[in-house]
């Protein structure tokens, strides 16, 4: 049988793309049975065949009431129906059995490998919110799997450590390379569950009342992971349920609809809405990640030129024979119905894109490919969804399986014995724990005691590489750069929007400013609250390496000799504890089909061989250094920093508990307009800039009412004012959020042409005029640069504070 190597790809979310180091190896599938019901065989990567589908005689599916609340497909992915139920339908006898009578609502069924049980999401009649449950296929053996404050949905099974059934021994050594292997008990090899969850009280970047991310669920109280890594899974524990969950993705908007790929990865949809991303509308991309969150990488929908634009992309699954990614393409990002579209799994580019439906005038949802090349779908011609076999030759719904006119029938889950794909090894045991392993065996548990947060490390081979043009948008290059032009990187953490006091928070408070409807009382722009994890220097060849917080959403900016962002990554990235990430440059696009030059980067050499870097890698620095003219002179730590120079792989652990920059949340910086910028304007600018000499920077921190809402000061309203006829995503009259280098305010403060994108004509019109570059100190000027590059927010301090802000009167 032929083998196909999909490539060794190295990458990370940078300038809208995420590419990560991973070797994905697959074999061509060998199918028998054809398009009719029968037996299909799958040849895995090592040439061993297993039966993946016998006769399909039963189908689980969801029935939802035909009301907006009963089937809220226009509120996707926050799909929490009322009164839905899961039923078992026998294709031979045509009998229908309701399995979830004890639930107020139940949906999202997914069958186990042997077809004898299934996982689902549901709200029990006894209460407790929307949780993950498990039940035998006959309706017996109900087991609750989560007890999370929030919403859990879309469970799928993952066969980690459970390719063979039965019990497995937990064997590991105490720490490092010391001692003998010891047995620490037995555990049933039931594998893991991956699901999508939204904690209670969070909002996404559109201020919707949810923000989903993917979690992995240890069905044996953390011991499945213990058998693999040597440490019990650390995360959110439910001892009364004997389960533990660990968040594996970090996105300020939503990651949802997980599905298993043939090579053991997790396929899912990801809403990317960082600030001005995709014209401020955001974009839904199809993404793939390891089951522990180690290597997220984009597949399709991440690029400006990809077909479908800002449409919704959900419920993606991979067909077996021709290996297509089939998904629901919706006219709106928050719709869960639409038309079926597809791209090749092996070459997910525009040339392989195809629209599978659209000529019959109906709506589709819930595609489910089978190994014998058939596919179940849910289809509605006039609002009544039923279950059908899809007719590929006619690009339309074919033979009807079941359609009850009183219910919307959807989410089919055929019952059959499934093949367990090769599972990918994990190097993290959850929050704050990383491990080093030899394939499928626990080897060395690593945790640095005393430090307040675990970290990960990433390296970029060349920060000057980019496929983006020079342009005024933050994700584009502000100017052309070569080796030596990029001096440092700024690492920015996004803060999840959590505002429990509705009297102190107002969505759309800055509708009159650049942020429009995506603004809030925290920000007059589309950029939510965020802080600076730190800075790291860039080598002369454009490479850089750094360590920083793990398990937080972040993105990067590359900085020139003035410390200004030349290009901003507008896709959220994340590191898992003690993992590494390799970045190849600033680009968009799918990681599949990319090939990267193997170069000897200085940062890589210094990381491994320089004595100054033997402690894992340089941690992010708190500040940049400049001369009096504003020229970059290096990075610097704060006065009270502790650098863990005696911590290195295989060495002593827990040497200090002092704050460490890049690791300690208390050591993180942010720039808050009220605290940091308004005092500069009051002291240096307001005496000249008033209503007769705009921008009007007077009035201090007194809130000014606009359209009946008093959320910001007069100075903030003036600086964030839009410019007629100008796209607000490239700024207004004075400020371009996330691109200080393209902002009129900064050009005047530095009295220099800073980029290839002049904010307006005749910026320096009069010779002998008053020069602004002498009024502010370099620290004051750079504080304004940082404020704009972060997104020009009003309130960048999460939680309550004593500075002025919006208040319902």
Swiss-Prot record:
Signal peptide, first to last residue: 1-27
EC number: 1.7.2.7
Associated pathway: Nitrogen metabolism
Note describing how the cofactor binds: Binds two heme c groups per subunit.
InterPro entries in alphabetical order: 6-blade_b-propeller_TolB-like, HZS_alpha_mid
Positions contributing to heme 2 binding: 685, 688-689, 772
Cofactor(s) required for function per UniProt: heme c
Induction of synthesis: Is among the most highly expressed proteins in the proteome.
GO annotation, cellular component aspect: anammoxosome
Record keywords, A-Z: Heme, Iron, Metal-binding, Oxidoreductase, Signal, Zinc
Binding site for heme 1: 583, 586, 591
Alphabetized Pfam families for the sequence: HZS_alpha
Domain named Cytochrome c: residues: 633-792
Reaction(s) catalysed (UniProt annotation): hydrazine + 3 Fe(III)-[cytochrome c] + H2O = nitric oxide + 3 Fe(II)-[cytochrome c] + NH4(+) + 2 H(+)
Protein location: Anammoxosome
Primary residence: other
GO molecular function list: metal ion binding; oxidoreductase activity
Group of enzyme by EC: oxidoreductase
Positions that bind Zn(2+): 303, 587
Coiled coil: none
Function: Component of the hydrazine synthase complex that catalyzes the condensation of nitric oxide (NO) with ammonium to form hydrazine. The alpha subunit catalyzes the second half-reaction, i.e. the condensation of hydroxylamine formed in the active site of the gamma subunit with ammonia, yielding hydrazine.
Domain comment as written in the entry: The alpha subunit consists of three domains: an N-terminal domain which includes a six-bladed beta-propeller, a middle domain binding a pentacoordinated c-type heme and a C-terminal domain which harbors a bis-histidine-coordinated c-type heme.
Subunit comment: Part of the hydrazine synthase complex that forms an elongated dimer of heterotrimers composed of one alpha, one beta and one gamma subunit.
Descriptive protein name: Hydrazine synthase subunit alpha
Organism listed in the record: Kuenenia stuttgartiensis
Lineage: Bacteria, Pseudomonadati, Planctomycetota, Candidatus Brocadiia, Candidatus Brocadiales
């Amino acid at each position: 049988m032929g083998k196909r190597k999909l490539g060794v790809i190295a990458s990370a979310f940078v300038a809208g793309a995420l590419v990560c180091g991973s070797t994905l190896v697959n074999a061509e599938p060998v199918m028998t049975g054809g398009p009719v019901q029968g037996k299909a065989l799958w040849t895995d990567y090592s040439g061993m065949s297993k039966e993946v589908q016998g006769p399909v005689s039963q189908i689980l599916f969801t029935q939802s009431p035909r009301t907006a609340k009963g089937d809220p497909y226009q509120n996707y992915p926050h799909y929490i129906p009322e009164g839905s139920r899961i039923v078992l339908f026998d294709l031979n006898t045509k009998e229908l059995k309701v399995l979830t009578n004890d639930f107020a609502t139940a949906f999202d069924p997914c069958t186990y490998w042997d077809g004898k049980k299934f996982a689902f999401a549901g709200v029990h009649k006894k209460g407790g919110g929307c949780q993950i449950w498990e039940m035998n296929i006959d309706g017996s053996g109900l087991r609750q799997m989560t007890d999370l404050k929030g919403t859990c949905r879309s469970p799928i099974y993952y066969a980690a450590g459970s390719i063979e059934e039965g019990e497995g021994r937990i064997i590991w050594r105490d720490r490092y390379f010391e001692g003998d292997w010891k047995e620490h008990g037995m555990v049933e090899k039931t594998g893991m569950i991956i699901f999508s969850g939204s904690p209670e009280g969070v909002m996404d970047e559109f201020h919707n009342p949810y923000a989903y991310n993917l979690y992995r669920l240890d069905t044996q109280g953390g011991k499945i992971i213990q058998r693999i890594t040597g440490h019990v899974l650390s995360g959110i524990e439910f001892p009364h349920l004997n389960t533990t969950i660990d968040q594996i993705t970090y996105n300020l908007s939503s990651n949802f609809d997980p599905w298993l790929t043939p090579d053991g990865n997790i396929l899912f949809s990801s809403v990317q809405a960082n600030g001005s991303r995709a014209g401020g509308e955001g974009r839904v991309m199809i993404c793939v990640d390891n089951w522990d969150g180690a290597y997220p990488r984009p597949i399709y929908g991440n690029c400006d030129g990809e077909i479908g634009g800002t449409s919704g992309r959900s419920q993606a699954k991979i067909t077996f024979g021709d290996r297509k990614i089939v998904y629901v393409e919706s006219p709106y990002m928050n719709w869960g119905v639409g038309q079926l579209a597809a791209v090749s799994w092996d070459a997910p580019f525009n040339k392989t894109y195809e629209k599978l439906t659209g000529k019959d005038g109906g709506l589709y949802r819930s595609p489910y490919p089978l190994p014998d090349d058939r596919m179940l779908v849910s289809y509605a011609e006039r609002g009544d969804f039923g279950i059908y076999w899809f007719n590929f030759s006619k690009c339309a719904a074919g033979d009807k399986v079941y359609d009850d006119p009183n219910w919307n029938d959807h989410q089919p889950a055929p019952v059959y014995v499934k093949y367990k794909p090769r599972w990918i090894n994990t190097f993290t045991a959850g929050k704050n724990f990383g491990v080093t392993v030899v394939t499928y065996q626990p080897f060395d548990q690593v945790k640095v005691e005393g430090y307040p947060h675990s970290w990960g490390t990433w390296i970029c081979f060349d920060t000057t590489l980019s496929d983006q043009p020079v342009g005024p948008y933050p994700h584009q290059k502000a100017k052309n750069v070569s080796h030596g032009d990029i001096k440092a990187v700024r690492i920015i953490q996004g803060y999840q929007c959590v505002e429990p006091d509705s009297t102190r928070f107002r969505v759309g408070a800055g509708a009159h400013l650049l942020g429009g409807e995506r603004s809030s009382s925290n920000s007059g722009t589309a950029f939510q609250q965020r802080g600076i994890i730190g800075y790291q220097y860039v080598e002369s060849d454009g490479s850089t390496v750094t360590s920083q917080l793990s398990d937080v959403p972040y993105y990067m900016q590359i900085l020139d000799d003035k410390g200004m962002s030349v290009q901003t990554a507008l896709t959220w990235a994340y590191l898992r504890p003690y993992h590494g990430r390799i970045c190849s440059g600033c680009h968009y696009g799918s990681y599949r089909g990319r090939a990267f030059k193997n170069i000897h980067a200085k940062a890589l050499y210094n990381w491994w061989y320089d004595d100054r870097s033997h402690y894992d890698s340089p941690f992010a620095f708190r500040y940049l250094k400049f001369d009096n003219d504003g020229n970059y002179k290096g990075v610097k730590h704060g006065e009270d920093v502790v650098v863990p120079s005696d911590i290195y792989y295989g060495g002593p652990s827990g040497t200090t508990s002092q704050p460490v920059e890049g690791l300690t949340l208390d050591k993180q910086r942010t720039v808050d307009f009220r605290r940091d910028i308004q005092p500069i304007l009051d002291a240096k600018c307001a005496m000249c800039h008033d209503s007769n000499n705009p921008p009007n920077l007077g009035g201090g921190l007194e809130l000014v009412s606009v359209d009946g809402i008093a959320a910001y000061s007069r100075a903030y309203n003036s600086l964030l004012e839009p410019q007629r006829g100008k796209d607000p995503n490239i700024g207004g009259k004075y400020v371009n959020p996330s691109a200080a280098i393209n902002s009129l305010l900064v050009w005047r403060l530095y009295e220099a042409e800073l980029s290839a994108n002049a904010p307006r004509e005749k910026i320096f019109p009069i010779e002998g005029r008053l020069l602004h570059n002498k009024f502010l100190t370099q620290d004051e000027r750079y504080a304004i640069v940082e404020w704009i590059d972060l997104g020009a927010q009003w309130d960048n301090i999460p939680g309550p504070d004593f500075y002025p802000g919006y208040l319902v009167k």
